[in-house]
From Swiss-Prot:
Gene name of the encoded protein: ADISSP
Subcellular location: Secreted
Cysteine-cysteine disulfides: none
N-acetylalanine PTM sites in chain numbering: A2
The organism of origin for this protein: Homo sapiens (Human)
Identification of the protein by name: Adipose-secreted signaling protein
Record InterPro entries: ADISSP
Family (UniProt): Belongs to the ADISSP family.
Phylogenetic lineage: Eukaryota, Metazoa, Chordata, Craniata, Vertebrata
GO CC entries: extracellular space
Positions of post-translational Phosphothreonine modification: T147
Length: 174
């Protein structure tokens, strides 16, 4: 069927612009309303009093410093630390009390692509087992899909070396 259509004339279609749209003056850039809050790290409280932190798109094999603010939590005191259940890919750097709650800074390593969730537990110094679970969710892109626009509060701090067999220093046996 596809071979039968080869001899047909190609269809010509036109594009019409709405009135007031200048085709020559348009650019290939996407512009968003300045009032949108899509460019910040989103922190939402879940039903079980844990927090979900959405950090947007990240690139695989890169390390990021993520800073966000948790609202005041009555179960935490001023002396907050990471619970002794460390995550391999998410490391707590600091927790500082601020008027809005707690400013949390952590380092995230994007180790594989897809929608990834890593957890840290925040505990009180000398507390009686009171912990708050914080889940950081990231959408990690592979290295062939460009560089993502990072949200406010997300900063790239380094790239991990990627093993590629074509760039090996080994020349084989002599």
């Amino acid at each position: 069927m596809a071979a039968a259509n080869k001899g047909n004339k190609p269809r010509v279609r036109s594009i019409r612009f709405a009135a007031g749209h200048d085709a020559e003056g348009s650019h290939s850039h996407v512009h968003f309303d300045e009032k949108l809050h899509d460019s910040v790290v989103m922190v939402t409280q879940e039903s079980d009093s844990s927090f979900l932190v959405k950090v947007g798109f990240l690139k695989i094999l890169h390390r990021y410093e993520i800073t966000f603010t948790l609202p005041p939590v009555h179960r935490l005191s001023k002396d907050v630390r990471e619970a002794p259940v460390p995550s391999l890919h998410l490391k707590l750097l600091s927790v500082v009390p601020v008027p809005e709650g707690y400013s949390v800074k952590c380092e995230y390593s994007a180790h594989k692509e897809g929608v990834l969730k890593e957890e840290i537990l925040l505990a009180c110094e000398g507390g009686t087992g009171t912990c708050v679970r914080v889940t950081v969710q990231a959408r990690v892109m592979d290295r062939h899909h460009g560089t993502p626009m990072l949200l406010d509060g997300v900063k790239c701090v380094g790239a991990e070396l990627e093993y590629d067999s074509e760039h090996s220093d080994w020349h084989g046996f002599d």
